[in-house]
Amino acid sequence: GQVWRFDILNGQDPSNLVTGGVIAQLGAEGVSGTPTADETRRFYNAPDVSLITDNQQQRRYIAISVGSGYRAHPFDLSAADRFFSLRDGDVFNQLPQTAYDSYSIIKDTDLVEVSGQTQTVITSSDRGWKFTLPMNEKILAESITFDDQIFFVSFTPDSNAAATCSAGKGTNFLYRMSAINGDPIVPNIDTLDPLISDIERRTTLQQGGIAPSPTILFPSPDPNCTGDDCKQPPLGCVGVECFDPGFKNNPVRTLWTQDGIE
């Protein structure tokens, strides 16, 4: 449950070429004393790293998103699994080793809880947010971030799966949340009852078993057509089960970016 960051200082001699260290402990490592079963979260997937521009706070930061789940034992029901989205504000700064040696490591308790909430304010001093999954749900695949929205799939085993020898199909849910504050992506967010916000964050997938990570596809234009109407909208898919990702623009290739330049 540890997240590491490394800075590569080009042109330096080998002894000073790389600096780095742990910046977050989201599982048992971050618990003082003996962790409970609830706190023993396991992580099997690489973090989903994206550059976010927060227009309200007029700043940019790196969002590091990752979910917990015991993939080696998907029927395990002991841990209280969560989805985490950390904030690293040192987007354009190369940190010296002394900064990593004294780094204030992000713990689970440092993050703002957004489950059962809407329009949560994540301030510039907050280290990020977390979403506690409903009971028995876990995340067994990587998330993906597009257009400041995070897409990820959770899995919950059949109610009797842990007590039987049969595999069971289980149920998969597709989540779609704001990368900025974890809000559900809905048109009525200003009036949405927080009590049903978690339901609005997810949809039930038809496929059983452990579903793969979501992916975003950008189909080629229709070759037999001319004009803007021929452009195909982006398409999100989890395996062969596809969905509307909620945005229409095609990606813009960015080869580099600079501090102060949007």
Residue positions per predicted region:
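Beta-propeller fold recognition
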Residues: 1-262
